[in-house]
From Swiss-Prot:
One of its GO terms (biological process) is protoporphyrinogen IX biosynthetic process. It comes from Lachnoclostridium phytofermentans (strain ATCC 700394 / DSM 18823 / ISDg) (Clostridium phytofermentans). This is Glutamate-1-semialdehyde 2,1-aminomutase 1. Belongs to the class-III pyridoxal-phosphate-dependent aminotransferase family. HemL subfamily. Transmembrane segments: none annotated. It catalyses: (S)-4-amino-5-oxopentanoate = 5-aminolevulinate. Pfam families: Aminotran_3 (PF00202). It is found in: Cytoplasm. GO terms for molecular function: glutamate-1-semialdehyde 2,1-aminomutase activity; pyridoxal phosphate binding; transaminase activity. Pathway: Porphyrin-containing compound metabolism; protoporphyrin-IX biosynthesis; 5-aminolevulinate from L-glutamyl-tRNA(Glu): step 2/2. Its main location: cytoplasm. Keywords: Cytoplasm, Isomerase, Porphyrin biosynthesis, Pyridoxal phosphate. Homodimer.
């Protein structure tokens, strides 16, 4: 028995399912989780001493690679001043100013502790601002585990094959309307029926929690148009895409301006943090300025703010990093496409920039239903082979691959060579 197996056995006794987030259990891929001891650059090292090339990057925030020396140094210095004060600090002001500078749609921003909290707060703000109740979300899009959004969600809920979560009262979801991702006609029909009571449309501009699913041409612009016509708040959930597709995220990449934007772990360089922000007139309804209440003891935590400020500053000062990320993405994802096509295995490789997903599917993947048509048993075999050869991929078909600045041609070559071995094994 490996040390990871021993630890998992112990964890099962004291933690539900042995993990603190379901996807980590490796249940959908028929493996036991690897317990990670440390990380450096593009590599993870488990408690048994095995090394992996990491394509999860802590689910996105380690865009500069693990254990970046500048971030590490800034965090150590911040810790020496104290871990939490429950009071205002200069660093949270600097962080807010930087986000407003980098993202033109954000005029004011409020820090919270996670992407889930950011989304939950943004929806409350949209309802308070509009005086309306209903929201539209998209099937397969995951916006955290708040009650009102666990309706036809993605990520772990999708992997588990559970459309909703037990413990969520009907009353919590009766104002949540759902449409198919990339179906602007379906959204129009919801507006036709409920237009006077739709407070917000919330969307992952690139869906990344049913695997990576790209917006079709005109979809995001269509949402913007419908929201404008109906006085509805457009919320972009950029927990995954924010500061990854570019310094101004998916909204800059696709040229669509939301009213509110939510962020998660990337603005803390992997530390627990989130934020929501947008137009000043909307954000001014938040307490203590307005009557929409939202608070948190650890919101704006000085250590998390320091880590995030350092990471965003590095990205701001090195725009060529995005060029490299895109080049590495084209190299990796493009060669994956070529290899699978030559092997004659049904697949779809959806990708944008440094974000991608390999679906074992025969037809184009463009929404929840087409994603669900993927062969999860084939993905399981693929995952196991790659993991045992030192390539750490998402332990579920319906999650994304992430690249970091630390991934270089050597890591890409090793990954592609390993993939050759997998393809040879299934011929």
């Amino acid at each position: 028995m490996t040390r990871s197996e021993e630890l998992f056995k112990e964890a099962l006794k004291v933690i539900p399912g042995g993990v603190n987030s379901p996807v980590r259990a490796f249940g959908s891929v028929g493996e036991s989780p690897r317990f990670i001891k440390r990380a450096e650059g593009a590599h993870l090292y488990d408690v048994d001493g095995k090394e992996y090339i990491d394509y999860i990057c802590s689910w996105g925030p380690m865009i500069l690679g693990h254990n970046h020396p500048d971030i590490l140094e800034s965090v150590v210095q911040a810790c020496q001043n104290g871990l939490s004060f429950g009071a205002v600090t200069e660093m949270e002001v600097k962080m807010a100013k930087l986000i407003c500078e980098l993202v033109p749609s954000i005029e004011m921003v409020r820090m919270v502790n996670s992407g889930t909290e950011a989304v939950m707060s943004a929806i409350r703000v949209a309802r308070g601002y509009t005086g309306r109740n209903k929201i539209i979300k998209f099937n397969g899009c995951y916006h955290g585990h708040s009650d009102g959004l666990l309706v036809k969600a993605g990520s772990g809920v999708m992997t588990a094959g559970v459309p909703d979560s037990l413990g969520v009262p009907k009353g919590c979801t009766e104002d949540t309307l759902t449409a198919n991702y990339n179906d602007i006609t379906g959204v129009q029909e919801l507006f036709n029926q409920y237009r006077s009571d739709i407070a917000a449309v919330i969307v992952e501009p690139v869906a990344a929690n049913m695997g990576v699913v790209l917006p079709k041409e005109g979809f995001l612009h269509g949402l913007r148009k419908l929201c404008n016509e109906n006085g509805t708040v457009l919320i972009f959930d950029e927990v995954i895409t924010g500061f990854r597709l570019g310094i101004d995220g998916a909204q800059g990449y696709y040229g669509v301006t939301p009213d509110l934007t939510t962020y998660g772990k990337i603005i803390g360089a992997g530390m627990p943090v989130g934020a929501y922000g947008g137009r000043k007139e909307i954000m001014e309804v938040v307490a203590p300025l307005g009557a929409v209440y939202q608070a948190g003891t650890l919101s704006g935590n000085p250590v998390a703010m320091t880590a995030g400020y350092t990471q965003l500053t590095i990205l701001k000062e090195n725009p060529d990093y995005y060029t490299k990320l895109n080049q590495m993405g084209e190299l990796l994802f493009g060669d994956i496409e070529m290899k699978f096509r030559r092997a004659g295995i049904p697949f779809q490789m959806n990708h944008v920039g440094s974000l991608g997903s390999l679906f074992f599917a025969k037809e184009e993947v463009y929404d929840y239903q087409s994603a669900k048509a993927s062969d999860t048993e084939q993905y399981k075999a693929y995952f196991k082979y790659m993991l045992n050869k030192g390539i750490y991929l998402a332990p579920a078909q319906f999650e994304a691959m992430f690249l970091s600045v630390a991934h270089g041609e050597e890591e890409i070559k090793q990954t592609l060579d390993t993939m050759d071995g997998f393809l040879e094994s299934v011929r």
